[in-house]
Amino acid sequence: MARGRNAKPSTRSKASPKTGAKARKLEPRKRGKVVLLSGGNPQIPKGDGDAPVQAYIAAMPGWKRAIGKRLDAVIVRNVPDVRKAVKWNSPFYGIEGQGWFLSFHVFTRYVKVTFFRGASLRPVPPGTSKHEDVRYFDIHEGDELDEAQMARWVKQAAALPGWVP
């Protein structure tokens, strides 16, 4: 295609290598390193099953990793047929055909456990939500995790209809 006399030459190269911010952003993933998002939340590709959840937990920074391992163990111990997945950079736990009952997410100073039908749990987890049924339980560094209470919540939550996105 011929250019007219007043046409500007293209400043775009035909085959430009990835450079700049975009290349730096992609580089860690090439090397197999996990990118930590805002608040230190691991960026794990979405996927079903235990493997992506374990990858998420392994990538949790510092003291939060131990909390992730303990939460996962409590859930598996109390709901042996639990279904696991990583969605929206968070591990999800559910029952096949019933939906998701629990998720957790890493923030800068705490790990937030989400009970999708938490308003129906007894006692009700303390963290409120703008969603009527959802309740949260935040775990901060140095907090003692009451595994017995967490197990009671997990059993109750797994018995309820779950959240289906």
Task: Go through each PLM region and give its residues.
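Charge-dense, helix-prone N-terminal extensions
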Residues: 2-165
